[in-house]
Regions:
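A short, gly/pro- and small-residue-rich
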Residues: 48-62
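Glycine-rich beta-strand-to-loop/alpha-helix junction loops that act as flexible
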Residues: 38-41, 160
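Catalytic core of DAGKc-family lipid kinases
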Residues: 63-155
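Short glycine/serine/threonine-rich phosphate/pyrophosphate-binding segments
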Residues: 42-48, 148
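Metal-ion/cofactor- or nucleotide/acyl-coenzyme-handling active-site neighborhoods
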Residues: 24, 158-160
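Short glycine-rich anion-binding loops that position phosphate/pyrophosphate groups of nucleotides
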Residues: 40-43, 63
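ATP/NTP phosphate-donor binding region
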Residues: 1-38, 50, 70-98, 118-119
Length: 160
């Protein structure tokens, strides 16, 4: 991958900034034309919280199961190290197929009236008490529906 990307940078085709997953913040993705995520599904889902819905993301599975049974399934990763060069060319030439994936986002209004907006979630969104042992009291409202609950929390999932 680094050879392919270095050649694109040297040829003036792209500008490249690399950031480790542990150091990523929203500001890293402002004004980007493309974000390339190298890793597995967990890497992509954690990074996706910081990327707005208009920025294309190219997932590259760095450790596919075809090479190692303990590798990543790569459900969200449409590219692999072996196909990266041609996949990147397709993206840069506007020939790649874009898949728009739904994301969940919650707005939580506390009893004191404070509004908290969650990060966008690619597949699951868990709302629960910060203390795992404590139950959560909450109301779920949508349209005319208004449900009061007391439980461990609530889990929302996309169909993906």
């Amino acid at each position: 991958l680094s050879q392919v990307l270095d050649a694109k940078v040297e040829g003036g085709e792209v500008r490249l900034d690399m950031v480790a997953r542990e150091q990523v913040c929203r500001a890293d993705f402002i004004g980007r034309d493309l974000v390339i995520v190298l890793g597995g599904d967990g890497t992509l889902t954690s990074i996706s919280h910081n990327i707005d819905s208009t920025t294309p993301v190219m997932g590259v599975n760095s450790h596919p199961r075809e090479m190692d049974p303990d590798g990543s399934f790569g459900f969200f990763m449409d590219s692999e190290v072996s196909t990266f060069r041609e996949n990147l060319e397709a993206v840069l030439n506007g020939e790649a197929i874009e898949n728009a994936l739904p994301r969940l986002q919650a707005t939580i209004t506390s009893t004191s009236g404070n509004r908290i907006v969650s990060d966008p979630a690619l597949n699951d969104l868990l709302i629960a008490n910060t203390h795992q042992y404590a139950p959560s009291k909450y109301r779920v409202q949508r349209g005319d529906m208004d449900l009061k609950q007391l439980s461990s929390g609530i889990l929302f999932s996309t169909f993906v």
